[in-house]
Structure formats: structure tokens, C-alpha cells
Design a protein with these regions (language model features):
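Short secondary-structure transition hinges
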Residues: 58, 101-140
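Hydrophobic alpha-helical connector segments
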Residues: 62, 66, 76-106, 155, ...
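Amphipathic alpha-helical packing segments from all-alpha helical-bundle domains
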Residues: 69-77, 122-147, 153-157, 183
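N-terminal intrinsically disordered/low-complexity leader segments
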Residues: 1-6, 200-204
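Helix-turn-helix
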Residues: 10, 18-58, 62
Length: 204
């Protein structure tokens, strides 16, 4: 069982690396089995992809589940640290953005893979519902700060995808991650939510 877990781990990490580096065209069965990493006293073979995952597409899905779970827990920690968004919404959302942004920029390879899968036919066909269910808790935590008519899930989806778009530009050297640019990036994301946020209660 330990060896099986090690083989699965190696294949998942290979998938993440290859998809991040060159997309799904790069992540062939041969490359998935042999691109990097090794286990002592063991010779990797493509057959293990089919034995443990059924297909390379199922391996792609397993890699996304790994990354989606990592992202969820990073966001969940941010929500728990802030402890609610009802008061001082913009300030607290800014703190949440800072934590999320730091996580995304600190995990370039994993986030490149995440984005490539997220915009692929594999996500639409295999992972969308599981992703929505996983992030229900984050949506629920943020729902109280939005107006009743707001589609909170759709708004947060737009904000998070925009954040990843900015991150890709940083990875590619098109945008500098700086003290000057960071507030501007947050303001763009905040403006995507502002119309739908509840007004703060006025002091009597």
C-alpha cells in the first residue's frame, strides 16, 4: 500500500509539472511516467497510469483535485484568520486578497497547472460540480456581505479568475508584483464586487 501511494503521488506531481510547463499536449502517458522523479528499487511504467487511475484523463483530474483542495484550504485559512467580513468590508477583503495573492504567487507551477485545467474541457466535463461543492463554504462565509439579489458564486468566480489572470501576467513578466501595482490589482477586483456589496450600517 505504501508503494502504491508513492506511485500515485509521483504520477500526480508529474502531471502537475507537465501541464504547467506545456499544457495537456506535453502530458503524454510516456512523459507522465518518466518525466522526473524516481522511486528506489522500482521501474516506472505507463501501465501504472491505467492501473491506478484508469486513464491519463483521470490522472489529470486527480492532479486538479489535489490543487483545488490546496487552494481551498489556503482560502479557508484566510477566511478563518479574518473572522468575518461584515464590518470594514474593504479593509478585510484587502487582507484576504493579500493572503490569497501571496499563496498564488508563491506556487507558480501549481497555479499554472490549475489555470490550464480550469479553462479546459476536462474541468467542464469532469470537475465542475466537485469544485463548486468544495468551495460552497467560502461562498457561504462571504454571502452575508452581499445584497440579497447578488449571485455570490458567480461574482466570486469572476473575481478569482481575474486574480489568476493577473498572476499569470506576473509569472510571464508582463506585470510587476510591486507595492505600487498590488493595490491597483486589488482595486480592480474590489470594483467587480462593489456594486453588489451591502452598504455599511450608519452609526446613529
Amino acid at each position: 500500500m505504501k508503494r502504491e501511494a508513492e506511485i500515485k503521488e509521483l504520477l500526480i506531481e508529474n502531471a502537475i509539472h507537465l501541464i504547467a510547463e506545456g499544457g495537456f499536449e506535453r502530458a503524454t502517458t510516456k512523459e507522465l511516467a518518466h518525466c522526473r522523479g524516481h522511486l528506489p528499487d522500482f521501474k516506472m511504467n505507463e501501465v501504472y497510469i491505467y492501473r491506478f487511475f484508469g486513464s491519463k484523463e483521470n490522472l489529470y483530474e486527480a492532479a486538479f483535485v489535489r490543487l483545488d483542495t490546496e487552494l481551498f484550504y489556503a482560502f479557508k485559512r484566510g477566511v478563518e484568520i479574518i473572522g468575518g467580513f461584515e464590518n470594514d468590508k474593504k479593509e478585510k477583503l484587502g487582507k484576504f486578497f493579500s493572503m490569497a495573492w501571496q499563496f498564488v504567487l508563491g506556487n507558480e507551477e501549481r497555479c499554472r497547472c490549475y489555470v490550464r485545467y480550469y479553462y479546459s474541457i476536462y474541468f467542464k466535463g469532469h470537475s465542475r460540480e466537485a469544485h463548486r461543492k468544495l468551495f460552497e463554504g467560502i461562498v457561504s462565509e462571504m454571502t452575508p456581505i452581499f445584497k440579497e439579489e447578488a449571485d455570490v458564486e458567480a461574482i466570486l468566480h469572476s473575481v478569482f479568475t481575474a486574480m489568476f489572470d493577473f498572476a499569470i501576467r506576473v509569472y510571464n513578466g508582463e506585470l510587476e508584483d510591486s507595492d505600487i501595482n498590488r493595490p491597483h490589482i486589488f482595486n480592480v477586483l474590489y470594483c467587480m464586487m462593489a456594486t453588489y456589496l451591502k452598504e455599511s450600517a450608519k452609526a446613529s
